[in-house]
Structure formats: structure tokens, C-alpha cells
């Protein structure tokens, strides 16, 4: 047997054969299956479905037809593959959640966003969508080339004469051999506007196109985060776009909130999304959810997520974004067939390819219409000549034995045409006139004359023929103008695009959140002022500032904390939900957290242990919390100043603490008998004021300390302390340029007058009785700061910062407050403004706000006035300031704004 066929066997190298065969297979998949054409944006199967429906008359204006019949026609005529592959493609073109402009109008079950399969093709019905007609319009006018089908029995178009850039409008996706494409859908109006810009200026920059093409427009809506991925995709053809579903937060009563998801990212399975959320809740990767329901219906998506009491909805939503496909990436690969070859193109290249294709289509259509008009004019000229010579025409026909003889006689005769010569020139007919101004009928003209009805012999019909010739002449002139002028051709192209836009464009569904985003949820967190409270037992909470009512000095306050196990409050400050915080622990480590991540509570709540919020080690607890400016650009000019109870200080660069892992980092080395009192951001031109519990204070410039890079250093001596005394606060003050003598002279001016000067009121220099010029007084008044000192027994006073002389670090300091048994030890020292409010908190959990305008301004060496009436064994343990924004006490509870805590910015 082998010998019998040996003469027909050709030995080949198997390696070479594998290369050739695999390459042929790869190109077949690329060109004939998986990659769309840049011109009409369709793969072969989609193109064949639309053309088959068009050929079968299954138009948008006609009744629906069974999908099985359509699939059968496509498979039998053009696409010899499995019926399921054809039907799946038809179904996708009918899904309004898959295509931005569905090309098939389906009736029946065509699947859902839950991943449900469409009903069998014998149950569903389909027809062309109205917009699909714009893909095949003018296909019968020689606009595109046709190829024979797989068995040579039919012809199919190699491409559809699409009137809009379907590749960009509906997108495409496919995996070929060694390459893949993934093009997102866009808004029709924006894409057509970009095409018009390109038509007007072929040298337009891609960034200029981005002015109208904002980004993809997904049929499922949702939102796009950031523009870097969009810019990369449009500039290079590749990019990653972050998609995020849309959600709303609603109050559902009983202090509970619910997250309502109304839009999900493109191509995300809704049922799987709900299952994933439930799975994450079960695994405790998402906490705080009490109920989860899919309430979606025909009116839209609604995923209802009810939260537990006092849970921060924004934090839960952030966890959902991070753990599920509610936020996902769309990897853009703008790969399409151009000139039969796969190519990754940028936005301008895709638009240019489409516009170039439409130029060819319009040119081919114009040539077709020109030829048709000329053919028609040629016949009408023959009819016009015949009517002008009707008697002779009738005589010839009557004298002829048959039609062929009559036709030959008509063609053999020379006919006078001088009277219609203007019409011949008007339509630019290519007839040949002899020297006598006569011509012969062509076979086409003679045949038309023989087929002419007798009613055409009337004078009115002759006039109508002449009018038709004039109209044809106008059309022919326009066609010739289009072919001769590219400018006119582009005008027509632009006009047709605008008509498509006017008919089918719709508002954008996908919103774009400009700016760069990470996995954080900060931009969804409502900005609100919060009171942060820390207890001795390591509990922390945040309470809305509006929960506390403003009270006058001397009021009894309200219960600010329900005491359990005699826990007392050790620190309180006011900040925004967006305030970044550094947490310093007893072992000298530092942790980082945003304020909104703290547990939300009420004034009577205890909060949560910080050990459950931060990754603390055994026997480690937080001793100090430092709020920072929200704008990190300001961090470049800030340092961190550490102060310990033993009087040590250290100046470090704030940028050293910008990136802190969740498990923290070493901040400062502490001796066993020392503790961290305070940490504050500061600038080089500012001053540091250290204050002790015994009423001493020391002021020195920040610049007198060098920046210590080592985080394990315990710093240098800042203040020399007496026995049993310790530093209780550190304040950052403005730097001053005036001399001590000038400051002392200025302080002789009554404080009421100094405040008036600072407000801009005029003053009489002679009445002040000081040896200073007006400019110096005005400058010092505008720069004056006041230091508030509060004692544990509720006494307080305000003193001018000018009264604290500047010395070198390491000294014993000066008297800050005259303390005694009545006043008790000092618990808080800080700079204040005239319209600030003071917040005090006691060891019993009481909290009171009072306006500082009622606190007396005195010298340093005084005992102050009573700020807070205390019960027996009750002590003030923490002090903070609130910037007041409302004149009335009643409004202050409803409209609190501003923050003036320990942060200097």
C-alpha cells in the first residue's frame, strides 16, 4: 500500500510543518473569528448575523422572527459553525447590559446580569435594532466589496458600511492565538464629536480629543476612578481603568444605616457579587453587616445591605470595594484588524481608520449614484428625442415586422438634437454628435423607446422629462463635485455623523471621578467634625461634635462618658473625619490611622479598646495621639517635636513618619522611668513652650534644636525640672522678632485695647503711653498669641505669649501660673484665640464647653478663675479647644465647624 502511493508522498520536516500549520491556524482565528475589524467594529459572526437579518427583511420596522430561523439562515449561508455559537453572539447583541447600543431587538428571555442563560432559540424572537440599519445603510450601492461564502453559493460583505464608529461605541472583546482585544464601550455622542474634530483637523492631538471623549461609557453605568488609565489607553492603546459600582447610604431607623448598591461595574455578575459579599461576611473579612438582600427588579439594580448599629457605613463600603468585584479593573487593549492585520491602536488611530473608511464608502457610493444618474439621463435623453420626433418614431415602429427590426431601424437613423443640445450638455452625456448635429440611438435608448407607454407622448410628459433631466443634471454636478473635492466629501461625512448623533445619542451613563484613587474610601467619607476621646483603660471613640451643647462658664456640664470599672478619660481632641493621626505608644512605637476608622459612638458610650484597632504588642498601650494636617503637602515643611515627662525633647522630620506599616515603627527610645508627654508638628521659625504641672514654663526656638535622624534617640534635655515636678504639656508658638523691652512695653497696654487694635480699630498713640511707634504696636497686636492654662481643680486663665521670655533650652523656666491647694496642679497649657471654645473633661466622665471670652486675661503669675465647678474627688483630666463659628449658643450645637486643637498648620 505504501509503495502504491509513494509517488504522491512529499517528506517534510515536522518542525517546519508545525510552524506553518500553527501560523495558518493562528491567522485564521485572528482574522476570521476573534478580532474585530476597525472599520465596522464587528467580528465575522456578528457581521454575518446583521447582514443575514438585513437580507431576509428582518428589519426594525417589520415583525419579530424566531431566533432559530435567523440562526439557521446565518449558519446555512455564511457561518458553517455550531448554532450555539451563532445564537450566543445574537443574544449578546440584544443585551442592553452588554452593548451600549444593542444591535438586535430581542423579544423574550435574553439572559440577565445574574448570569442567567437566554431561553432556547426556539422560544425567543429577534429583529434588527433601528441603529443596526446604520451599519448596513448603502450596502446595495457598491460601497463595500463582497466575497463568496464558504461554498460559493452566496456572497457576503467583507465589511459593513458602518455610518458610526461601532468599534468604540459598543466595544469588543476576544481572545485569539497569542493576542487578545478588550475595547470598552463609549458614548455615541462623544465619539462622533471626536470624529468631527478629527475631520476638521487631521493633525489634532490625542489630548484634544480627550476634551470630548471623557472616557468609556458602560451600559451598566457605575463610575470610573481617575483618568490615568483612560489617558494611557487613549494615548497608547493599552491601559487599566478602575470601575466602581455606585452605592448610596440611607438611614433605616434605630440608629442603623444601609448601603444601597444601584449600579455595578461592566460585565460583573450581580448574583456572584451578592454571593461574594455574603462569603466575605461569613469569613469575617467584612464586618458590620446584619442583612443582605437583592431587591433588583425590572426598574433597576438594588442590592440592600443593612448594617449593625453604630457601624460606619463608609468603612464597610470600602471593605466591599476591596474584597469584591464592586470595584474592579477593565484592562484596555485596543487591538483590531487594520488592512487585514491585527494592530494595537490609540484613540486617534481608531478614529482616523474609521474616517478613512467612510471616505471610501462615500466615494464608492457617489460613483455608484453618478453612474446610475448618467444611465438614467441617457435614457431620458433618448425619450426626449423620441417625443420630439414622435411621428417618425411611430412610422418606423409600424413599418417594422418585429421588435428587433424596429430597434435596429431606430438605432440606424440619425436624429436632429439641436433643440435639446443644452440638455445633453447639462447632464454631461457621452453621446457622439456628428458634424451635422445629429446622433444615433444606443441600444439602451432604443429599447426604452420601444417600452415607452403612449401616455408619455403628451406635451406635459415632455416637460416632465426635461425637468427630470435638469434634476439629474444637478445631481450629477454634485456627484462630480464630491469626487473632485475632498473638502466637500468630508462635509458630507460630517453631516451624516451628526444626523446619527441627533437620532441615537443618549446621555452618559458612567460618571468619571477625576483625580487619582487608591483602595481608600476617603473621598466617600462625609467631612464632619468629631470629638475623639481616649480613656486610661485604652478605649477610644469618636463622637460628632454636634452631640455636645455649648454651656456658659461655671455650668455643671453633661454626662460625656458612662463609667465602667472606674475608667477615666486621659485625652480628648477635635478633628475632621479625614484627619490623619499618629499613635505613639508607651514603648516608643508609632502607628498611623485616619480618624474615620475610629469607632463611632455617642457621648455616653465607652468606645473600643485600641488594642482591637491597632496591632499592639503584649503590654503595649497608646500614650499619645497626634492629629496632623490633612494636606500632606504641608508635611514637607513640618518637623515633629517630642517631649517627655522628664524634660527631654527631640526634633525629627515629619516625613520620617509618612509611611508607617500596620504593625507600626519605632519612634523614640524612652528610659524606664520616663514617658512620652506630647508630640507635635512644628516649623523651624516657631517656638516651643514646655509647661510643668508645678506651674513652670520654658520657651525656646525650634531652630535651636538640630533635626535628629535616628528614631531610637531619646533626644536632649529640654527643661531642668525640680524634684517631683514633670512636664505636662508642650505648645507650639509663633516666632517673634521684637525685643524683650518692646514686648514688656507693649504688655502695659490694657488687654482690651490690644484686642481692639488687633481687630483693626484706630488708636491714639499718646493715650497708650508706651514708648513704641504705631507700626510696632499694630504688628505686635496682630501677632499676639494668648496662652490658656487650666488646673485640675477647674481654674484657668489666659496670658499673653509675649510674657514668656525666650531662653535657651535646658533651663528651669519661669512661673506660668501661681498654683496652690485651691487651684491644684496644672493639667493643660495651650495657645487660644478670642472666639475659641474650651472643652474640659473630668475623671468622672463629665464634659463641658465654655466660651473663652469669659475667661480672664491676666499676667503669668496669677491663679486664674473657676472654669468648671467640680464635685468632691472630681478632677479635670483633659483639655481641648473648639473654634466657634456661630454667634448663638443654640446654633452652635447644630452648625459646628472648624478645628483648633493641638495641630499648628
From Swiss-Prot:
GO cellular component: chromosome; cytoplasm; DNA topoisomerase type II (double strand cut, ATP-hydrolyzing) complex
Alphabetized UniProt keyword annotations: ATP-binding, Cytoplasm, DNA-binding, Isomerase, Nucleotide-binding, Topoisomerase
Chain ranges for the short sequence motif GyrA-box as given in the UniProt record: 551-557
Catalytic reaction list: ATP-dependent breakage, passage and rejoining of double-stranded DNA
Domain Topo IIA-type catalytic: residue ranges: 35-524
Quaternary structure annotation from Swiss-Prot or TrEMBL: Heterotetramer, composed of two GyrA and two GyrB chains. In the heterotetramer, GyrA contains the active site tyrosine that forms a transient covalent intermediate with DNA, while GyrB binds cofactors and catalyzes ATP hydrolysis.
Additional free-text comment from the UniProt record: Few gyrases are as efficient as E.coli at forming negative supercoils. Not all organisms have 2 type II topoisomerases; in organisms with a single type II topoisomerase this enzyme also has to decatenate newly replicated chromosomes.
PANTHER family the UniProt entry points to: DNA GYRASE SUBUNIT A, CHLOROPLASTIC_MITOCHONDRIAL, DNA GYRASE/TOPOISOMERASE SUBUNIT A
Protein name: DNA gyrase subunit A
The encoding gene: gyrA
